[in-house]
């Protein structure tokens, strides 16, 4: 006769507790002074009419203003630190987006250049950032040019 096969006993598995999850400490770096200034500027630009917003932006990047020095210092420090670099770029992008919104909601017509609001915002922000490198005597002329580029120059020059 063939050997009868023995039935294997069914054993219950012991319930094991999952290993306790290790708490990961996340440290959020404090925002730099440049980030704080850029975000405050973005907030100020949000509700202002375009010509006023451009004047605020140009004033913020004037050669004697604090913002250009702070941004440059933060940029130098963040060159080897990805998180700091991204945070600074994000803060600058908030200024550009705020300016873009202001341009899009502006009651006046499109600028003579025919740019979309996002491209015009980028161009105007770059122009205002460049004002920091101009001699103080040329700032008023540069602001006038920025206003003309936007299509929001005062009537009669």
What are these regions (language model features)?
Residues 1-2, 9, 13-36:
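Helix-turn-helix
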Residues 32-67, 116-124:
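Hydrophobic alpha-helical connector segments
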Residues 35, 54, 58, 96, ...:
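Hydrophobic core segments within long, regular secondary-structure runs in both alpha-
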Residues 62-73, 82-108, 118, 141-145:
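Amphipathic alpha-helical packing segments from all-alpha helical-bundle domains
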Residues 84-85, 106-157:
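Hydrophobic/aromatic-rich alpha-helical bundle segments in the mid-to-C-terminal region
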